[in-house]
């Protein structure tokens, strides 16, 4: 079930790990320890919304470009050049930059379905850019980054496919909509392990404790959690977390879920996610989905029955194809 397309580009093939359901997977043997380390009593936090926070949109913004009608960035200087893709990068001069120290820039070239992502990005004179790191992803491919390489995220994963986007929630809530976003979300933890597991490619920690999650660890909201009492936007996010879960993608505040800013978000609605504590989550073992350690492709597994909880009947394989319309 791929993301709602952006400019006609699906965010990775339908059988990519980001687009795989995990409601039928076994619980990870270290699940209880992982959850305790992140915070059993700590609530979820949507790190996205409408309006501004400290003068910047709330969330990680993205934009599109057309390489056939533009020129690549003339020079781009990376702090971590040895783990960054050389380019060329098609980054519009006015590309939105995430507020705060991460300063992510995400751009989809809709001509080639290529995703460009920068970390700690800053435009310079003459169209040049500087950045901490940069990663280029072919959205039509399941290829992962080289083992051990970072990306614009500490886990070496793409950011954009893990963001909650308002257009997807709107499609989920429309008549005949799915009731959920058909892909995993990205989230952060304050303390991660000095390790990464598939599909992650990089770690950013000195902590060797097996009780804290490695980069790439995947969590899901327990199927027994009643989402029916929640407001619409929060309910879609929670149903998504039951079916597709979320991936540890970076170090940051505990249980912070990534999303793109949009004036359509209802911040009061999303705020209700804070009442969902970590104790309602479990880590899953998704190693059985792996086809090749260097690929994000998944083998098809049929999950067990899942409660509908007022969002419509949901029966599918792990790689169900779903179509969502962009507003």
Which residues make up each language-model segment?
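Short, surface-exposed polybasic-aromatic patches that bind anionic ligands, especially phosphate groups
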Residues: 1-310
